[in-house]
């Protein structure tokens, strides 16, 4: 029965994909909301489509796993996998799991998702003893084999960097937490009572690599602050393998192709409905569930809390929507 439901979903969602029809953002909103009922589209107030393009990476970084990448295999009885799972409630004392960050106008999503999921995993593996935020900027600026910084990077290489060089601590620009907080300010949006200045016309450049703590109020040396991984790997493409990995070790990093309509996601279970391809994006999968019979992944984005469902989104599960199930990576921390 489960496979019949998935087959039906594939057929339905395939019928929805009619790219390049609407010519304006307003037309995309109307088209999405009139053609399907799984999710609601709404033009965001605080982020433009041009800003979103700067926050994405080239689609080459979303490619499925290559043969040289180790793929972890879980021996699991699929009948034992729960119908719903949410890392936020499974590990409520891990401060990173509930944290939504802001990558600003830089295609640093690959570094953010790695730092976020690694932060979660250190807390989980240590039973809360290592409860911190790891620095997206450390891997963004200092991993020379990861890719091109603000132009994008390979998620698996960020996890390999965690094994080889480690991540120091560091939170958001606003919080100035840890050794190396993010140095690129939010821009063009109002968050709470703070309105940030307009974004740079061409987006941000990749910050320079600095092998020291940039937070002057942090009293731990850069090398002593490093947190290391023991392994880095890809996760099998089957839904049950991704679920088993999250249950065993915590949230994973995944990459997918972004289309114009995703920019307008407001609520519901996203399925690509229309619009041009914009680029690739990396995110953190926290769990899964169903909404009126539609299976979904629960995902944390890095576009601040004003976007989507308070910074989160749900995307249809079991159909490899936009490639999201074929580019999942993770690793085990040293604790």
Curated annotation (Swiss-Prot):
Its EC number is 3.4.22.-. GO terms for cellular component: extracellular region; extracellular space; lysosome. It holds the Pfam family Peptidase_C1. SMART domains: Pept_C1 (SM00645). Disulfide bonds join 94-123, 106-150, 142-209, 143-146, 179-213, 187-199. Residues 1-15 form the signal peptide. One of its GO terms (biological process) is cellular response to UV. Belongs to the peptidase C1 family. This is Cathepsin B-like cysteine proteinase 4.
């Amino acid at each position: 029965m489960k496979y019949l439901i998935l087959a039906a979903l594939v057929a339905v969602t395939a019928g929805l994909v009619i790219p390049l029809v609407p010519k304006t953002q307003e037309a995309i909103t109307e088209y999405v909301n009139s053609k399907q009922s799984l999710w609601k589209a709404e033009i965001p107030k605080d982020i433009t489509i041009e800003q979103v393009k700067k926050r994405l990476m080239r689609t080459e970084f979303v490619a499925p796993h290559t043969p040289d990448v180790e793929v972890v295999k879980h021996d699991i009885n699929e009948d034992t996998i729960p119908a719903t799972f949410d890392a936020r409630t499974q590990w409520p004392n891990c401060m990173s799991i509930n944290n939504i960050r802001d990558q600003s106008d830089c295609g640093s999503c690959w570094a953010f998702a790695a730092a976020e999921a690694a932060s979660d995993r250190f807390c989980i593996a240590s039973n809360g003893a290592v409860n911190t935020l790891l620095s997206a900027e450390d891997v963004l600026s200092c991993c020379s084999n990861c890719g091109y910084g603000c132009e994008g990077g390979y998620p698996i290489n960020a996890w390999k960097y965690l094994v080889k060089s480690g991540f120091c601590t560091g939170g958001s620009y606003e919080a100035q937490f840890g050794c190396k907080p993010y140095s690129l300010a939010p821009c063009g949006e109002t968050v709470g009572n703070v309105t940030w200045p307009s974004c740079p016309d061409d987006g941000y450049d990749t910050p320079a690599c600095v092998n020291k703590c940039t937070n002057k109020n942090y009293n731990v040396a850069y090398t002593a602050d490093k947190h290391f991984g023991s392994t880095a790997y890809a996760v099998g493409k089957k839904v049950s393998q991704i679920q088993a990995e999250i249950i065993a070790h915590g949230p994973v990093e995944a990459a997918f192709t972004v289309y114009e309509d995703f920019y307008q996601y407001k609520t519901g279970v996203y399925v690509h409905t229309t619009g041009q391809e914009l680029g690739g994006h990396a995110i953190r999968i926290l769990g899964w569930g169903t909404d009126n019979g539609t299976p979904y992944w629960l995902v944390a984005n890095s576009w601040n809390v004003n976007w989507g469902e308070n910074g989160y989104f749900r995307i249809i599960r079991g159909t490899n929507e936009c490639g999201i199930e074929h580019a999942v990576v993770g690793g085990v921390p040293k604790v």
